[in-house]
């Protein structure tokens, strides 16, 4: 392996690393994945599930762009559930329980069977840099591997430290050593390196649980798979999850031992995830609550391990034993592995571009938890984008950037690059200002053409997508053009639904806009629907919410005006009158690409945006008077001229 050359080197084999490798290799680039443990490829370090609110949206987006996660999630699903099914379409989300061992195996096989991709077990100790250009990596044995682009996807492993009570151990998760050297080198190069914290709950033995004291939680019978390539018939047997709750006794034990928690005695300095708090955090922040729910989730079909969702903890083992036994159903529980916390390094993400290349070192890309995110889906989305852009940088293609109005992936990356993060970033539907047009059901309509243009979606797969879109259009046209007359028989059927009688002839589209009607009611009126729910549901939503969608699209058009106003690379913020020192510092730090991005920077007020616009207009007038010299590409002059 010594002195071997590749196009793209990917460091790490988690969810970000997998998508980065596959996208690069599928675009024809000679790609190498380096991981410390090939047995842990695609390993689910925490919860054995994929998707959720907003997260499920991103899994579908990854899939339509040619990524891998959706297929793997469908293939290894052991329970399917649609969250918020009774709420509006913008906030519904798909979540699947997975067999974590089969998931890892499926992803590993995908990597080993992918042309243009090699997998190497080894540890990357440092980068090979030629001034500000990354040209490869050095392994622990001293061998050098050269690459035209390098992607770091190290997850929680950079200077990772595990905490159980007051005991500490080096590692990014149980059974795996930390990555030492990379973050120190980046810090020496000038990167702002910070610490974050995450945690995981205990794993319990199935036979030690009294299931009669818990509440079964079944999955959904109707399945909308993540991938357009998957069947709606799940391949694996479906299992139950179970619900139970903590008690006041549970909380008393935890409160009485907070002095033994590394989070509460000052040992852990990193900030933990706000939206996935430990049980210590829950009973402290929500002291008025007498109980918290927890779900018992099987980790697979051939394992006895149960994941205790919602009870992440880093308390000592004896304390965990005591408080677990106060939870109904767990009175005699046996713990296979205790919960623990992990503290790790991350790079402040305002130091990267939207293409996920670092601003300081060329041809070095970052993806996943190294950028301050939390979650498999967030990591996979970044891995896909980093892999595409690393490949494009070598192939001479333009950077691939998704807008906030195009995808949740675009919202996430823009948030990270523009605002940074001080805590593990998790995706929510509330983060997207255009969420009504970023639904799960219309992902194909939003992104399939882009996926084909990128080259990650095969001709055969694109034909499936095209067929699906055409069938949706046919159905929508039939709804628009088929008229229903208010005959006696029709009025009688409407009364049974019930819905008000028709006072005049209506198209089926007009009728479907009634809030009490669903597409299934149309069949009572002899309207033939497509048998595929993936055809019917998106059309029904478009019809019912057409007015809201139109208003959202109008807002997008308005916001795009600011997004299309490019800011020059050499813009001297220090010279702009009307900007506060804080605003100047933040603008210089982020270096926004557009005026739209500038207005999203925390601490930059609307008055600052006006000041920038006035400055640029004034600069343009000076130039038109011939009072300024010529400048190079990317300068204020060239952009204003553009």
Curated annotation (Swiss-Prot):
Binding-site list for NAD(+): 272-286
SMART domains in the record: GIDA_assoc_3
GO BP field: tRNA methylation; tRNA wobble uridine modification
Binding-site positions, FAD: 12-17, 124, 179, 369
Cofactor: FAD
Keyword Membrane listed: no
GO terms of molecular function: flavin adenine dinucleotide binding
Family assignment from sequence similarity: Belongs to the MnmG family.
Assembly: Homodimer. Heterotetramer of two MnmE and two MnmG subunits.
Chain's role: NAD-binding protein involved in the addition of a carboxymethylaminomethyl (cmnm) group at the wobble position (U34) of certain tRNAs, forming tRNA-cmnm(5)s(2)U34.
HAMAP family attached to this UniProt entry: MnmG_GidA
UniProt-recorded name of the protein: tRNA uridine 5-carboxymethylaminomethyl modification enzyme MnmG
Organism whose genome encodes this protein: Bdellovibrio bacteriovorus (strain ATCC 15356 / DSM 50701 / NCIMB 9529 / HD100)
Gene designation per UniProt: mnmG
